[in-house]
C-alpha cells in the first residue's frame, strides 16, 4: 500500500478486550446500535445472526490474546481503534491490532518466514506478494484452510464471490492465499472545473484542433499538460502536471505500480499480462520466471519500458512545479489539493478522503469537489486487452508457522472486519472498497457526488483493468527494492532511461539466478532462458500470439484522443 506516509500517526498498538464473561449478544447489539446503524448491506436481523455466529465460533478461544498487524492508513486505524475493541467485547478474544509502516510490515513478515517464529498471528499484507507466498509456500492456502482446519471458524456468510479482489489473491494453482481487507486504485485526476471553463475549452481547441477532455492516450495528456503550464487561472500561474522524483524508496512503487503497463509494456491479459507482466518479467507455461531483460524474452528494458521512463522525466521537467523533482511520494501527495495543478496522471484514490475536506481550494462551497478522477490514459505501446493501471489490495495473510488455534482466532477477527455487517460503515470511513454489496449500497449512491468519481469508477466495467502486481514476481521484497535505485539514477540524470532499465533487468535476473541456484522455490521457481536478441524474442512472441517485447515505434507521438468526462460516466451506466 502506498499511503503509509499520508497520515502522520505514529506506530500504535491498542490492546482491547473484555474478559470472556462479558462477551456476547448484549455487546453485539450495543455495537450495532452505536456504530453500524443502517450502514450495512445486511438488515438488522441478519446482522445479529452474523454476530451470534461469531460469538459461538469464538467460544473455544475466549480469553486468548491475539496479535495482528497492518500498515497505518485510515481504514486500518478504524479497525485498530474501533473494530478490534468491538470484536474483543463481543467474542472475548483479546485483539491487539498493531499499526506500523508498510516496510515494517514486510520486514516482520520476512522475519517470521525466515525464522519460523510466530511474530504475529495474522498480517494485512499487500497482494503484490501473491507470487512470493505461492512460491515459498509459507502462507496458508485459505482454500485448503477453509475446507479443513479452519472449517469450523469460517463464516457461512463470508460470501467470497462478493469480494471484488479475490482474483488478485489467487495463485496459478487456483487457490486463494489472501483475503482482501481494503483496496484502492491508481487513476487519472483532473480539475473538472477548469476543463469545463468555456475560455479554456475554446483556447485549447484553437491551439490543438480537438476538444479539451479526459485524455485517452499519453499524447493528449502531454498536450493538456503543455496547455495549462504557465496559464493564469484566478490570478495565479498553474501547472499542467504533478509528480515526484527524489531518489527514495517511494520512487520504486511509482513504477512497480503498473506505470510500465500504462505505457504498453508486457503482454495482454487480466488481471496481469501473460507470459510477460508489467514488471517485464516473463514466465514459461509452468509459471517459472525465465527472464526480465529482453535478451531472455522479458520486457523490463524493452522499448515500451524505456519510453515510459522517458515520458516520466520529460513531463516532470517541462510541466510540473520545479520542486517536484526533489520530492518524495508523501511530499508530493498534498500538492494538487493546493489548487495550482490541472491534472495528474498517477494518483491514488486513497487520497480521496484528504482531497474532499471542506475549505480546500479544490472544493466547492456546497461540499462537492472541483476535481474528478477518471481512467488513466495509456501510452503508444498499449493495446486493448492489457491492464491499464494499478490497484492496491491489502489482504489478510495467515502463515503456516502460526499455531492452528491462534490462526483460527485471528481468522475470526479478519472475517469480522471484512464482514457484510461492518463493511459498508468501514468503507465510508476509509473509502477502500472491497465488496460489491458495499459498492452498490444506497448510502454510496447518496454520497457519490461528494467523492469525485470514486463510486462511479468502482461501479463501472472499466475497473477490471486495474490490478495489483501479479504472480510472475517470484520474490516481491527482494525485487521491489531494486527499482527505486535504478530509476533514481535516471531521475537524477546519472543514467539514461535505457541504461537505468538495462541495469534494473540485470539486477532482477541476478536475484532470480540466486533463487534458481538455491532451489528454494522448487519447480515453480525461476528457470532462466538462454539469451537471444530483441528481434528473436519479438518474432517468437508474435508467432505465439503474444506481444512482448515489442519493437520500437519510430513515431511515439500518436494522434491525441480525449473524451468528455460526463459522456464517459454515462457510457458506463448503459
What are these regions (language model features)?
Residues 25-60, 127-187, 370-375, 547-572:
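Hinge/lid segment of periplasmic solute-binding proteins
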Residues 50-57, 74-94, 189, 193, ...:
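Short, polar/charged alpha-helical segment
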Residues 51-53, 65, 368-378, 428-491, ...:
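Long, aromatic- and glycine/proline-rich binding clefts that accommodate carbohydrate-like moieties
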Residues 85-162, 198-199, 203-205, 335, ...:
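Extracytoplasmic "Venus flytrap"/periplasmic binding protein-like
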Residues 100-108, 216-220, 323-338:
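Short helix-initiation/N-cap motifs at beta->coil->alpha
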Residues 127-139, 143-147, 163-210, 222, ...:
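Periplasmic solute-binding protein
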Residues 170, 174, 317-322, 331, ...:
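Extracytoplasmic/periplasmic substrate-recognition and gating elements
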Residues 220-226, 263-326, 376:
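Glycine-centered hinge/linker elements that transmit conformational signals in sensory
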Amino acid at each position: 500500500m502506498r499511503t503509509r506516509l499520508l497520515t502522520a500517526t505514529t506506530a500504535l498498538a491498542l490492546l482491547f478486550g473484555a474478559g470472556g464473561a462479558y462477551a456476547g449478544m448484549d455487546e453485539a447489539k450495543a455495537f450495532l446500535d452505536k456504530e453500524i446503524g443502517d450502514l450495512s448491506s445486511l438488515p438488522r436481523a441478519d446482522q445479529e445472526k452474523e454476530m451470534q455466529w461469531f460469538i459461538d465460533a469464538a467460544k473455544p478461544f475466549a480469553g486468548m490474546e491475539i496479535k495482528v498487524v497492518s500498515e497505518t492508513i485510515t481504514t486500518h486505524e478504524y479497525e485498530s481503534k474501533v473494530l478490534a475493541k468491538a470484536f474483543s467485547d463481543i467474542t472475548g478474544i483479546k485483539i491487539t491490532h498493531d499499526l506500523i509502516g508498510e516496510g515494517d510490515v514486510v520486514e516482520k513478515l520476512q522475519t517470521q518466514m525466515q525464522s519460523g517464529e510466530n511474530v504475529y498471528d495474522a498480517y494485512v499484507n499487500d497482494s503484490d506478494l501473491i507470487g512470493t507466498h505461492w512460491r515459498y509456500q509459507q502462507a496458508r492456502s485459505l482454500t485448503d484452510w477453509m475446507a479443513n482446519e479452519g472449517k469450523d471458524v469460517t463464516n457461512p456468510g463470508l460470501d467470497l464471490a462478493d469480494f471484488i479482489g479475490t482474483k488478485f489473491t489467487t495463485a496459478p494453482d487456483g487457490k486463494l492465499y489472501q483475503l482482501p481487507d481494503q483496496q484502492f486504485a491508481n487513476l487519472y485526476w483532473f480539475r473538472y472545473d477548469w476543463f469545463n471553463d468555456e475560455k479554456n475549452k475554446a483556447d485549447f481547441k484553437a491551439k490543438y484542433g480537438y476538444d479539451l477532455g479526459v485524455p485517452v492516450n499519453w499524447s493528449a495528456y502531454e498536450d493538456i499538460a503543455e496547455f495549462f503550464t504557465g496559464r493564469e487561472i484566478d490570478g495565479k500561474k498553474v501547472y499542467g502536471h504533478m509528480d515526484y522524483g527524489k531518489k527514495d524508496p517511494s520512487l520504486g512503487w511509482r513504477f512497480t505500480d503498473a506505470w510500465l503497463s500504462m505505457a504498453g509494456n508486457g503482454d495482454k491479459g487480466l488481471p496481469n499480462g501473460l507470459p510477460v507482466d508489467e514488471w517485464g518479467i516473463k514466465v514459461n507455461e509452468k509459471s517459472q520466471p525465465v527472464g526480465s531483460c529482453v535478451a531472455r524474452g522479458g520486457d523490463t528494458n524493452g522499448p515500451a519500458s524505456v519510453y515510459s521512463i522517458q515520458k516520466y522525466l520529460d513531463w516532470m521537467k517541462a510541466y510540473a512545479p520545479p520542486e517536484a523533482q526533489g520530492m518524495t511520494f508523501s511530499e508530493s501527495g498534498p500538492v494538487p489539493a493546493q489548487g495550482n495543478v490541472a491534472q495528474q496522471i498517477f494518483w491514488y484514490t486513497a487520497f480521496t478522503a484528504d482531497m474532499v475536506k471542506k475549505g480546500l481550494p479544490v472544493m466547492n462551497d456546497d461540499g462537492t469537489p472541483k476535481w474528478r478522477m477518471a481512467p488513466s490514459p495509456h501510452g503508444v505501446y498499449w493495446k486493448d486487452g492489457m491492464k491499464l493501471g494499478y490497484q492496491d489490495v491489502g489482504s489478510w495473510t495467515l502463515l503456516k508457522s502460526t499455531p492452528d488455534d491462534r490462526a483460527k482466532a485471528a481468522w475470526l477477527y479478519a472475517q469480522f472486519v471484512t464482514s457484510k455487517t461492518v463493511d459498508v460503515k468501514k468503507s465510508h470511513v476509509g473509502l477502500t472498497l472491497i465488496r460489491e454489496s458495499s459498492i452498490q449500497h444506497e448510502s454510496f449512491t447518496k454520497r457519490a457526488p461528494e467523492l469525485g468519481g470514486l463510486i462511479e469508477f468502482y461501479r463501472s466495467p472499466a475497473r477490471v483493468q486495474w490490478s495489483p502486481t501479479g504472480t510472475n514476481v517470484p520474490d516481491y521484497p527482494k525485487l521491489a527494492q531494486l527499482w527505486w535505485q535504478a530509476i533514481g539514477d535516471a531521475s537524477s540524470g546519472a543514467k539514461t532511461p535505457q541504461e537505468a532499465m538495462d541495469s534494473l533487468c540485470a539486477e532482477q535476473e541476478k536475484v532470480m539466478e540466486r533463487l534458481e541456484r538455491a532451489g528454494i522455490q522448487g519447480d515453480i521457481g525461476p528457470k532462466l532462458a538462454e539469451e537471444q536478441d530483441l528481434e528473436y524474442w519479438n518474432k517468437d512472441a508474435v508467432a505465439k500470439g503474444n506481444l512482448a517485447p515489442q519493437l520500437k515505434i519510430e513515431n511515439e507521438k500518436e494522434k491525441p484522443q480525449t473524451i468528455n468526462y460526463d459522456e464517459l460516466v454515462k457510457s458506463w451506466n448503459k
